[in-house]
């Protein structure tokens, strides 16, 4: 894949499986919109499996959760299926739960806390997000190469797929 044009090694479209999203609220919708916008604007996404026709991007991505697994459905620019990458979600359960808890604290702090308290909670939130992004990069190793910012945005979207009312 190293011979491929780097400008093609990217996601051009992201879709979340609507059946996987069980609950919505305005904060979650805003997080989803921002993550998708930022992801489309700037990302590095390189599936590691070679394809017989040499296809090397750009990619359309659909994320869904099924039977405790995260599924990355990867398609060509024209929408034709390319491959699916499946990850078990067991190792992500705690980071997702912790991230939700710190986000709740952050949203509460915004309403009632001092700037210094908000900054402290925000730093903790960012640290958890960074750790989860690194974990995602490790889990994708050998399957899909992504940069750190892409992994952070993908983790945000994975969280959106796990929100319960």
UniProtKB/Swiss-Prot annotation:
Pfam family, one: UPF0262
Domain of life the protein comes from: Bacteria
Protein name according to UniProt: UPF0262 protein Sala_0765
UniProt-listed HAMAP family: UPF0262
Family under the similarity heading: Belongs to the UPF0262 family.
UniProt cross-references to NCBIfam families, sorted A to Z: PRK02853.1 (NF002769)
